[in-house]
């Protein structure tokens, strides 16, 4: 099928990637980088002809209407005082990810970047990060979504929406 683009998403891209991995990427129509923002500039310089996009980005964690330390960027914070909640200020994230604001700013500021797919639109049952793999954890939800399991938007939902709608369309 020569009519459709072929792509892959991978989290191993860096300026030092070698071998079969690079050969495979070179034959793709578009190269997806999972959480590759830190390596993007070096990969772009090494491969200026690649169409590159963020195939999995952000991994911010949040609980709707729960707020912690707005001046701090918190990552993988699972201390007991959190009561199994993540901050809806947009300042909680996993160690390998970025906040929604950081991911969106990165995308906006790089003309050669073809866009991004955030992880994830909706919360889901499983991967209760940052509490997964801990015994006796009552948490089931993933925290990653910009919409929770009840279908209600979290604050970052409005950040993303504001980038696509004008004030006249959605005042």
What positions do the PLM features span?
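Extended substrate-binding grooves/exosites of carbohydrate-active enzymes
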Residues: 1-171
């Amino acid at each position: 099928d020569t009519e459709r683009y072929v792509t892959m998403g991978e989290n191993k891209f860096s300026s030092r990637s070698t071998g079969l991995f690079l050969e495979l990427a070179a034959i793709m129509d578009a190269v997806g980088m999972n959480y590759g923002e830190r390596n993007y500039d070096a990969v772009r310089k090494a491969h200026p002809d690649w169409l590159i996009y963020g195939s999995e980005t952000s991994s911010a964690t949040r609980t709707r209407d729960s707020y912690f330390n707005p001046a701090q960027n918190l990552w993988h914070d699972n201390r007991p005082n959190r009561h199994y909640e993540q901050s809806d200020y947009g300042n909680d994230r996993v160690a390998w990810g970025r906040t929604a604001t950081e991911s969106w700013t990165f995308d906006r500021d790089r003309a050669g970047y073809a866009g991004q797919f955030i992880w994830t639109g909706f919360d889901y049952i499983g991967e209760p990060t940052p509490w997964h793999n801990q015994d006796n954890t009552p948490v089931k939800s993933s925290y990653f979504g910009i919409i929770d399991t009840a279908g209600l938007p979290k604050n970052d939902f409005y950040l993303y929406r504001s980038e696509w709608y004008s004030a006249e369309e959605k005042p």
